[in-house]
Amino acid sequence: MATGPRYKVPFRRRREGRTNYHLRLKLLLSRQDRVVVRKSSRNVQIQLIAPTPDGDITYSSAVSNELAKYGYTGATGNTTAAYLTGLLFGLKSLQKGYEGGILDIGLQASSAGSRVYAALKGVVDSGFEIPCSPEVFPPDERIRGEHIAGYREESSDLPEQFEATKEKIFAEFS
């Protein structure tokens, strides 16, 4: 299939839609640790990754499934869970001695107010240093889950549950 001088096959991970090599090169040349945020419909995953010649090393990570340990019973794929996961990740990383990094959202669309930026706000609120503009963060009402509590009866206590979970996370790492 890839024969002849006029045809170039992209790298496998580019073909699969998993890696933007131009962005990855810029991030690697910065020589800073990357705070990688990945989301699915059910979870949000955040990792602190450092590049090395032998391959990337993961220093710290948090997944929204871990919020159940802190009493959070809501959905783990929403904006509220993304913020709490970012907060948990930031406090874990600070406890391990890491102080900052740069955001890596990969091939995800960069939309102000999205779950990616809710997770970033959680990381920044924990005290972890990431250069960013506060204009991209979602409103506090969305982070607390008031928009969900307004239309879903099962989640009517989500803002209170958010505050309780946030206090438990801070209590564990203080």
From Swiss-Prot:
GO terms for biological process: ribosomal large subunit assembly; translation. Pfam families: Ribosomal_L5e. Disulfide bonds: none annotated. The keyword Transcription regulation does not apply. It comes from the Archaea. Keywords: Ribonucleoprotein, Ribosomal protein, RNA-binding, rRNA-binding. GO terms for cellular component: cytosolic large ribosomal subunit. GO terms for molecular function: 5S rRNA binding; structural constituent of ribosome. PANTHER family: LARGE RIBOSOMAL SUBUNIT PROTEIN UL18 (PTHR23410:SF12), RIBOSOMAL PROTEIN L5-RELATED (PTHR23410). This is one of the proteins that bind and probably mediate the attachment of the 5S RNA into the large ribosomal subunit, where it forms part of the central protuberance. HAMAP family: Ribosomal_uL18_A (MF_01337_A). Part of the 50S ribosomal subunit. Contacts the 5S and 23S rRNAs. Belongs to the universal ribosomal protein uL18 family. This is Large ribosomal subunit protein uL18. It comes from Methanosarcina acetivorans (strain ATCC 35395 / DSM 2834 / JCM 12185 / C2A). The lineage of its organism: Archaea, Methanobacteriati, Methanobacteriota, Stenosarchaea group, Methanomicrobia. The gene is rpl18.
